[in-house]
Amino acid sequence: MTERELLQGYVSKPAIQNALRVIRFAEGTERGGPDSYRVMFGGSLAPDLKRHPDRAITGGGYTSTAAGAYQFLSPTWNEQAKALGLSDFSAQNQDLAATRLLRNRLMSIGGLSVLEKEGFSPRVSAALAPEWASLPTESGKSYYGQPVKKLSELQKIYGQAAQPASTAQQEPGKGQETSTGSFLQGFMSAMAGNQPKELSTTDLVKQELMARLLTPAPEIDPLDFLANMRPIG
């Protein structure tokens, strides 16, 4: 399976769609329709989506070739298009390229799966800030010193409320119990007839083996695995 095929399987996931919506909102291109994908730096629209417009536009003290829903700079788009074999600047291809940029930037904190675990958390925003200037770093400022959106705004767009702590981040035994722990506790309780007793060495070995059998293997994200592959030699 190619990287492009893997990305096509990921781009429709709710967590990815929410993150892409956040970026469009932050970059000022979210217009609720196909025009979002035609926006050039400064707000004017590209005539079509046959290719990246590659026009240097000056406005507000800045000059940029940024274009599309995710404001791809011309060199950035060319790099993504080459890597994924994209032949035009269509909305579908822009989503694929943006998902690849998301994946690359999030690799340092766990890959795309971190979006499903944490939502648009402060460290997710900070990891993406070097790619999109409108996203805040952990200090709340733009990585490039440009105007930036508030994290609370972005979290609302993502579909979550800012919370000081997530139950998913609590340690087992502090406000929650893992499914494996709950199952194992019930199993051992039933085996012992709910009566505490001193366990023999054999019993302890059996419990350890049972705990290992019931502990699920860690999930491996194929996109993250592919991104970490290096050529041999």
Regions found by a protein language model. Give the residues of each.
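Cell-wall polysaccharide-cleaving catalytic domain and substrate-binding groove, primarily
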Residues: M1-S87, L96-G193, L199, V205, ...
